[in-house]
């Protein structure tokens, strides 16, 4: 894609199904989805990528952790089970601040980021989530630093899920 270059297929990332560049949504063809996806998964990816496009309208400089978290939370995030913690570690704070898509994927971003948005929504309300998307200003939205919110979320993951 334009965002990552033509090297993406060479990385062997067969999970790659779609993307957005601003408000333009790019998807793998449902008629030829490749080996990792089927027609129905392409249909679900449409909503996910449209959420990204809408978030991009709200804030074109949004952090990857937030935009993926919102897109997964509102569209197709898999349910989270505490047993996952036996196999995958909660992403480190520095990983949640990276805008590198490979870092995001490798640290478990697709497993965890929607739980971050879920935590913010349940704890502070959807209006605060929307404000955070627009401003990226944790202090203004929550009267707490980004790191403090991260630590609260880790506590939520460790204690909320059964």
Predicted regions and their residues:
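Auxiliary, metal-adjacent structural segments of Zn-dependent hydrolase domains
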Residues: 1-21
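Zn2+-dependent metallopeptidase catalytic core
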Residues: 1-8, 43, 47, 153
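Acidic/His/Gly-enriched intrinsically disordered linker/tail segments
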Residues: 16-20, 38-41, 45, 57-162
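Active-site-proximal loop and beta-strand segments within enzyme catalytic domains
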Residues: 33-35
